[in-house]
């Protein structure tokens, strides 16, 4: 006779798992009913701030303390003068763009928060998926669709983190080139172009973050009954 298969846990381990599940469900409930609406309102207010409504992008430019070298000598100068090499003036400490850094200080935590909340929702729904068996699986299909969408949001948020890291890398390269090739003005212009471009990226990120939270609220609240009770069983709460 075949032995029944299953995971056997000690009484203490089962208790700890149950505590984890209860805490998870409470976090999910708080996220849906309190955190989500408050976060949508906050991001909406943030988008009304002057710092996210700059019309003159030139005002975002940070000063580049990179000395401009003297023009090259004329052809008719004496040969002895040409042989006298002048050292290229060196630049000192080059800070980042303070205005952009201030915006990043606001946006980066929001990106991290949404990523963590997506993980929370994914874990919560995964713990609500019932035992796989014959019967009415319509609710399970809804759970899977919601999971698919939340994972898609998480992937897009992770792309925001890549965009932010890429900004520092590309701006750093542009500053390095501008400080090395001090006579090439295009490298200086490239630094300003990166600052202006990332400003648009950061505003778009906040717009997307607000939209993602609104989407999560809609898709979860609209399908909450099937998410928490996929088999149509009687349950007193959202878990």
Swiss-Prot record:
One of its GO terms (molecular function) is endopeptidase activator activity. Signal peptide: none annotated. The modification Phosphoserine is found at residue 10. GO terms for cellular component: cytoplasm; nucleoplasm; proteasome activator complex. The keyword Iron-sulfur does not apply. Residues 65-86 are annotated as: Disordered. Residues 72-86 have a biased composition (Basic and acidic residues). InterPro entries: PA28_C, PA28_C_sf, PA28_N_sf, Proteasome_activ_PA28, Proteasome_activ_PA28_N, Proteasome_activ_sf. GO terms for biological process: regulation of G1/S transition of mitotic cell cycle; regulation of proteasomal protein catabolic process. It comes from the Eukaryota. The modification N-acetylalanine is found at residue 2. Pfam families: PA28_C (PF02252), PA28_N (PF02251). Keywords: Acetylation, Phosphoprotein, Proteasome. Coiled coil: none annotated. Heterodimer of PSME1 and PSME2, which forms a hexameric ring. Belongs to the PA28 family. Implicated in immunoproteasome assembly and required for efficient antigen processing. The PA28 activator complex enhances the generation of class I binding peptides by altering the cleavage pattern of the proteasome. This is Proteasome activator complex subunit 2.
């Amino acid at each position: 006779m075949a032995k029944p298969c299953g995971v056997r846990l000690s009484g203490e381990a089962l208790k700890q798992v149950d505590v984890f599940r209860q805490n998870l469900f409470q976090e999910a409930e708080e996220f849906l009913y309190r955190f989500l609406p408050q976060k949508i309102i906050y991001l909406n207010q943030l988008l009304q701030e002057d710092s996210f409504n700059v019309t003159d992008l030139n005002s975002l430019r940070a000063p580049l303390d990179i000395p401009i070298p003297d023009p090259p000598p004329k052809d008719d100068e004496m040969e002895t003068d040409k042989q006298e090499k002048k050292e290229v003036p060196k630049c000192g400490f080059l800070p980042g763009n303070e205005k952009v850094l201030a915006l990043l200080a606001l946006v980066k935590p929001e990106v991290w928060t949404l990523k963590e909340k997506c993980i929370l929702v994914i874990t919560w729904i995964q713990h609500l998926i019932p035992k796989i068996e014959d019967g009415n699986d319509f609710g399970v299909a809804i759970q899977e669709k919601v999971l698919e969408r939340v994972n898609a949001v998480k992937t897009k948020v992770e792309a925001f983190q890549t965009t932010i890291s890429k900004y520092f890398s590309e701006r750093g390269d542009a500053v390095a080139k501008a400080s090395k090739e001090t006579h090439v003005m295009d490298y200086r212009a490239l630094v300003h172009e990166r600052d202006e471009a990332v400003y648009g990226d950061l505003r778009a990120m906040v717009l997307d973050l607000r939209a993602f939270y609104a989407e999560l609220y809609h898709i979860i609240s609209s399908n909450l009954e099937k998410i928490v009770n996929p088999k149509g069983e009687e349950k007193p709460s959202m878990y």
